[in-house]
C-alpha cells in the first residue's frame, strides 16, 4: 500500500451536513493579486493561529521607504534613495489586550522582530509602530493564538548563538578546535582527494586577469539591458573561474595545512580584492564573490596573514559587506523573494559576518541582521516546501539552504533542519523531478534541466543525512548506482557544491521506505504546483504529468503558465512548455518562454496572462488517493494588461512592449477553471475546462512539443486527436472534445525568433536555439465554453486506443467511463468511474466528490495560507 500519510489533503469529508452547508463550494477571488512584490500585511495575520514554530513578528515598511528594488542588475541608480538611518520601529506584545500587564516592548531598526524566547501558549496581542520624529505611530491591535503541534520549531536567540562563536580563527569552514580531528577523519573520503586534485592543478595554472573580460560584443548590442547582461556574464566568467580556483586552494590548505596552498590562495585573493572597481565588472554576484574570497581567506589564513594583510582584507570586507547590508536591510525582509539575495548573497554576507565578528564593529550589525532575518523569512517562502521560481533556479539556492543552517547547527547544537519546511521540500525536490527524469517544466531555464543534476542529488543527499528522510536516500542511491562519481560533477559549483558538507557530516544515508512507498501524486497548494507518476521504480515506464496554478503569478523567475500542464514518459517531455530563456527580460524570453503562448493552457481572445504577481492562479481543491487523483486550478484572474510597475519598468528597459499585438490586453474573462483527474496509474488523465466571459470571447486551447512535431487527426468529427512524441519511445495522445467547432493550426516557428546575443562559449561561439512545435485549437466566440480532453501517455510500442463513445454519450477510455457536459447550457459537470475498481469522481458545478473504496470525500474551495 502506498504511504499517504504525508499528503496534506485540503479537503472536507462529508460528515456533518450542517457544517458543510455553511462553507461555499466556490470562492471567487476579487483581489488584484494574492501575493505582493513587497509586504502589505503584518505577519502573523490578525486572528492567526501558529502551532508549528516560534512567532516572528513582521510588518510592512512605511510608505516612504517602500521600493520594488532595482528592476535589473545595473539599474540601481533608478531606485529612489532612502535614508535608512532614519527608519525606526517599536513593537509590543502581551497576553493582556490593554498592554498593561506583562507587556514586552522593544525598539528595532528593521520591520521585523523575533522574541528572545518563544511565546508561551495562549492568546497574544501585539502592535508595531513607525517611529517618526521620536513619536511612535502604533498599528491596530493584532491577535495571534499560539499552540503546540508537538513538533514546534523554536531555534535559539541571537544572544545564544553569539555566545557559541569561537574567539579563534578559523571558525567558518572549519572551527579551529576541531581542525586536526577534521583533517584526520577526512583522509579516507573521496571528497578530500577531489579538492586536492583540483588545487594541485590550480598551482600550475596561470591566474586569469580582470583585463581578460571579453567586451567584443558590446558594439553589437541594442540597449543598456543587453550591455549590462553581457558584461555581467563575461565578468562572471573570469571571476567565477578564479573563485573556484582560489576556493580549491583554501579548502586544500584546511585539509592539509600545507603552506603552498595557502600562499598561492593569499596571493590570488589580494590581487582580486579590488576587481569590483573595474568598469567591466557588473552585477551583485561578482561583488558577493569577492566578499566571500576576502572573508574566507581572512578566517582560514588568520594565523598566516601579516598585520598589513589582515588590515587590507578587513578594509575590503568592511566596504563590500556594508554595501550588501545597506542594500538588504529594510528591503529584502519585506520583498516577496529578492532572487540573488535568497540564492547566494545573504549566505555570503552571513559567513563574512561570523568570520569577522569581534574583529570588525560592523559585523555586530551584520550577524544580528543575517541571523534574525533567516529566522523570520528563511529557508522557504511558504510552508508547503515548494519553490515558486521553478526547477532550474531552485538549485541555485542549494548552498544557502544547507550551509547556513548547518553552520548554525554546528555552533549551537540546535537542529535547524527540524524546521518542517525541509521535510516538505524533500517532496518538492523528488516529485517535481523524479530520478533520471526531465524537470516538471516550471520557471526560467527549465528547458535545460534534462535530469536531476549533481547539485540536486547532493542536496537530497544532505537532507537525507540531516533529516533521516529515507525517500531522499533512495533517490540518491539509485542515482549513484548508475554513476558512482555523479556528485563530483558539482565540485566547486558556485551555487551547489556540498562536498565540504559531506567531509564535515558523518551521518550516514538512512535506511527505510524508498520511492516505491511514495504516493502517486503530490500537491503544493501555496506554491501552486502538482505532479503525478505511474511508476516510481522504473523510470522507463513512468507516465508523469505536472501542473501549475500559482498565487505567485509570473514574477521573479516564474512563468505566465497558470492552469498549464506538461506530460512525460520515460523521463522525457512530450506536451511541454516551449521557448528559451536567453536572458531574464529578452524579447523572445518574455514573449515565447515566459509568456502564456508558450504553455499548455488557454488564450482568451488571443491574449495571455499578466506578467507579475497580478497574473495569478491558485489551487482551490485537490485529492491524492491510491486509485484516483484530482487537481482543480483557477486562473480566472490571471488575464489582462500588464499593470505591475516593476515589470513595466523592466519592459521599458528591455524593449519589451506589452501590447495587444504581443499578447496582452484586457479580456472579458470571468472564469477559467481547469479540472484534471488522474485516472489511477493507467497513464490516462481527463481535463475539463470551464470558461466564462461577460461578453462573447474566443478561447484557444494550446499544446506544445519541443523535440518532434505533433500529428493532428480530425477524421472523427467528435474530437480532435493530437499526438506528441518524446523522441525516446514515449507518446501522449490527446483527444480534445469541445462545445463547438474548433479552428486548428500548427507551426514550428516561434512568435519571435530565439536569437542568442548573450550566451557564447569560451571561443566566442553563440549557441543556436532550436525551434519548437505549437498546436492551437481556437473556438468560436461565446460567453460560455467548455473543453473536455482525454490524454493517454504511454510507450509508443503500445499504440493508444481511441476513446470509445457509447450510445448514451458516455466516453470509455483506459478502463474508465466518463460522462461530461460540454454544452454551454446547464451546469458544468462530469462523472467518472472505474470499470475495474470501486472508485469514482463527481462534479456538478459545486462540490467535487470522490468515492474511493467506500470513503467519500467532498471538496469545496479552500484558499491557501499565504503572506507578504
Q: What are these model-predicted stretches?
A:
Residues 581-868:
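CBM-like, beta-strand-rich accessory domains located in the C-terminal region of large
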Residues 23-75:
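Pro/Thr/Ser/Gly-rich low-complexity, intrinsically disordered linker/stalk tracts
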